[in-house]
């Protein structure tokens, strides 16, 4: 069984913001794999299905970004999901829009949703797909930037990174994460 989590904030006002690109990737996977995100439990919304013979759970924590681990850990405990069968998708300011970086482990890098996940799992050693949102320009505050919507110029790159993140998740169902890192980080 695999768990794929996209980080974001709940509520319509955050729907298409930069900080919610992880949620957008989960929506893409749900559409691709015909998985309904209709279960509400573990402080999140999730759905399960079978993809290429593998049971997959897709989760969007509804805790607000900074408390994401409060949703992830109880679901992992309930379904007895090992950390190596878990991947998290989230926004990253240090990566250009349209680009991805896959990592096997690491620090939170200033991302509060990842910080919460590390805190609740008790380890930094989990797989992640970092989706580029770039840095704010013209002195804009980071909080205003990540909670802002993508510009029309950014949308093609955003759609590309959502597609590539979904492709990476799909390959991960049948290949080691290290192998797909080599493919998608190049």
From Swiss-Prot:
Is-annotated flag, keyword Hydrolase?
yes
Active site: residue positions: 19 (proton acceptor)
Q: Where does tRNA bind?
A: 14, 64, 66, 112
List, in alphabetical order, the GO biological process terms annotated in this UniProt record: protein quality control for misfolded or incompletely synthesized proteins; rescue of stalled ribosome
Q: Which CDD domains match?
A: PTH
MF terms (GO), sorted A to Z: peptidyl-tRNA hydrolase activity; tRNA binding
Instruction: Point out the annotated site residues (description: Discriminates between blocked and unblocked aminoacyl-tRNA).
Output: 9
* Entries under Gene3D superfamilies matching the protein: Peptidyl-tRNA hydrolase
Supply the InterPro entries for this chain: Pept_tRNA_hydro, Pept_tRNA_hydro_CS, Pept_tRNA_hydro_sf
Q: Name the UniProt key words of this record, in alphabetical order.
A: Cytoplasm, Hydrolase, RNA-binding, tRNA-binding
Question: Which is an annotated Pfam family here?
Answer: Pept_tRNA_hydro
**Assembly with partners or alone:** Monomer.
Protein name per UniProt = Peptidyl-tRNA hydrolase
Q: Which organism is it from?
A: Bacillus cereus (strain ATCC 10987 / NRS 248)
